[in-house]
């Protein structure tokens, strides 16, 4: 009996010695909770912007006008809302204020990107507003609605350009600028039934590769994958080029921009246009590239990806193979992996659309992380 007890004891000790190191190893590689991963990563990015990214006049990458400065301010305040009164943010806000024009727009002198600059500046001023910017924001709203492509530009609702926004100063409307415009109106408190947002919806649905449901363009049925492209105006254009039959190829960043904007305009998850967009997203789920565009616009893609899925209330996405994806966690981990030693992000593989600019790309990454938070 005593011998049996000794054998049992020996096997028990061996089992303990075998299991304990494995358990210890598992504990060592376990990920911190999502919030901690986001906060730690965002703090490094914010430190980069505040320590290395800001100029003496308060701006970030001023060669792009006010846009990058506004995106950086908004990105920082998304993570640190109490930083509004910090010296760095106050300097940046003063720089943005210096770009407020008599027509209500917020843009650099002589800018050809008036809608884009004003729309993103609105996002920053809304985040920092405690009442001090009420008047400026009201005037910015009037400016944005005034330059929307509608009857004021001499076109009817049947025109493919109707309801859209371009960079400004009569530039052809496109989905990217229209998405920034709709987001600005939403930030300003406009509801889904706002007239300008509903006009924008007419343009947005015409950028989708889907027949019917308000899409009467010649390109609507040539691909039919539910994704979105750059613009249907002036004959149409996709940054992902065309198919042999003249179809305008869908790509990732515009599809997420389109989905987000449709949701802001009040379309439900059951609407055929939203369903089709989600089908494209599931069939082209990726964090390694901007589907249809490779590495071009990758961080712009990440930020539209996160904003759209957050707006859609999506938590787990099944891809084309039926594999489930916790997109918030996966995108956070991808951004952790890509963060530079100095805390910044940059698109080292493709600098198209200014993604060689660390301040801009870091702002995109921080905005993405903010929407990964639950």
Model-inferred region functions:
Residues 53-54, 97-100:
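A non-catalytic alpha/beta surface segment that caps or lines the substrate-entry region
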Residues 25-44, 59-88, 102-142, 147-333, ...:
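An alpha-helical repeat/solenoid feature that recognizes helix-turn-helix modules
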Residues 1-5:
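N-terminal secretory signal peptides that target proteins for export/translocation
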Residues 50-56, 316:
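Large, well-folded core regions of big proteins
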Residues 8-20:
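Bacterial N-terminal signal peptides
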Residues 94-95, 360:
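Bulky hydrophobic/aromatic packing residues
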């Amino acid at each position: 009996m005593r011998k049996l007890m000794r054998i049992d004891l020996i096997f028990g000790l061996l089992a303990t010695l075998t299991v304990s190191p494995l358990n210890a190893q598992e504990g060592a590689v376990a990920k911190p909770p999502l919030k901690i991963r986001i906060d730690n990563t965002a703090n490094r990015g914010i430190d980069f912007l505040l320590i290395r990214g800001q100029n003496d006049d308060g701006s970030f990458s001023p060669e792009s006008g006010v846009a990058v400065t506004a995106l950086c301010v908004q990105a920082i305040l998304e993570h640190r809302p109490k930083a509004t009164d910090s010296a760095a943010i106050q300097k940046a806000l003063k720089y943005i204020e210096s770009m407020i024009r008599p027509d209500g727009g917020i843009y650099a002198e002589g800018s050809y990107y008036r809608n884009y600059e004003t729309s993103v500046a609105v996002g920053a001023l809304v985040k920092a507003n405690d009442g001090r910017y009420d008047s400026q924001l009201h005037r910015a709203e009037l400016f944005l609605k005034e330059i929307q492509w509608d009857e004021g530009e001499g076109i009817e609702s049947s025109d493919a350009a109707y309801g859209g926004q371009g960079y400004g100063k009569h530039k052809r409307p496109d989905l990217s600028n229209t998405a920034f415009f709709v987001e600005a109106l939403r930030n300003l408190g406009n509801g889904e039934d706002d007239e300008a947002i509903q006009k924008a919806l007419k343009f947005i649905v015409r950028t989708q590769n889907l027949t019917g449901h308000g899409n009467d363009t010649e390109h609507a049925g040539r691909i039919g994958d539910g994704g979105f492209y750059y613009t249907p105006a002036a004959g149409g254009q996709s940054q992902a080029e065309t198919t042999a039959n003249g179809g305008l190829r869908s790509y990732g960043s515009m599809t997420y921009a389109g989905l987000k904007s449709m949701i802001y305009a009040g379309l439900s998850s059951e609407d055929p246009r939203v369903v089709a967009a989600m089908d494209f997203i599931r069939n082209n789920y990726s964090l390694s590239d901007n589907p249809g565009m490779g590495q071009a616009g990758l961080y712009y893609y990440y930020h539209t990806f996160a904003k759209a899925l957050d707006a859609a209330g999506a938590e787990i996405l099944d891809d084309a193979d039926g594999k489930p994806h916790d997109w918030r966690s996966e995108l956070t981990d991808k951004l952790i992996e890509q963060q530079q030693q100095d805390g910044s992000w940059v698109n080292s593989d493709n600098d198209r659309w200014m993604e060689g600019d660390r301040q801009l790309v870091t702002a995109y990454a921080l905005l993405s992380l903010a929407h990964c938070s639950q």
